[in-house]
Amino acid sequence: MEFQKCLDATEPVPYSKIIAIVKKELGGAARVNEEFQYIDPQPLASASVAQVHRAKLRTGDDVVIKVRKPGVEGTLQADLGFLYVASRLLEILQPELGRTSFAAIVSDVRTAMLDELDFRKEADNIEKFTEFLGRAGIADAVAPQVYERLSSERLLVMERFNGVPLTDLDGIRGYSSNPEATLITALNTWSMSVMMAESFHADVHAGNLLVLEDGRVGFIDFGIVGRIPQNVWASLRDLSNGFISNNYRLMASSLVKMGAADGEVNIDAFAFDIERVMERLGSMEAQLDTSAVIDEDTGRVSYGTSVNVDQEAITRLLLDIVGVAENNGLKLPREFGMLIKQALYFDRYTRLLAPDLDPLRDDRVTLPNGDGRTDVVAR
């Protein structure tokens, strides 16, 4: 299933326009013919920003090419610029909205989206993640090799992974005899990168985590990454301890330390609001989908099982957490939201692949402790 879910589906750009961009980025048709045996005209994936195609190099390497769609940068610049101006006007006209800081949020989104347009930054993110894997001695996880000599701001040529998404139960069983161990590998790799790498993968939805044919976990699509400031770590550690013990007051006080408060925060009231949100988290369940597949040659019907992780529900829950903080007079760091959203994804994967696993108490799970090391935290 390779890169099929690395991007959200949108209307693809005609291949003639895609190959024209490839030729321009590589210096002409002669260079393209020199480097590539073929490029599949049919897109593997298409999103608002980029389109992905299978290809094979003259060396025999199977690759994918990620091409920025024409006109995307100008459209995004204009739309996000207008949105920023509108948010500033809204804050001026309604000062009570200043606590939410719409303009700051829009500015962060604008920066992140424009960063995604420059594939050189994504290539750099992949390189740094690969270096982290080497330093940490992690052999069971991998990121795709980037072909730098063939890549540019608008073109990214990467190793092609063959595997299945982390939510494809039947597919995982074909590549791994122990899905729970595979999940732990993915979780450990990601959580260690939060502390030990220069940045962490900030978009770990199932399409970006693959179980490869050799059983390794493949991380793809590094367009969005996050970084946690050192001064936030102590608060995160207390937040984790509060979560483990269902101590909502400790969770509330740690969030107060982490965020910028308008004034005195009522810890007890804040803790009550957090408890309501945590009850919603406990009620969220991943849905199992079973589908029939007909073999065209034999006519035999087989059934496959996968998990449907409601990304919209995860986003809504994250917004509820941020909203509760803001209603209690807090502005949480942007990185906190990015981190929590990834943790919510892993919570869903755990409920499906390893329902008996408690990541916060299981000694097989490695958690960052905030001082540059990783170990068991308050278990």
Q: Where on the chain are the PLM-derived regions?
A:
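Catalytic-loop of the protein kinase fold
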Residues: S199-A206
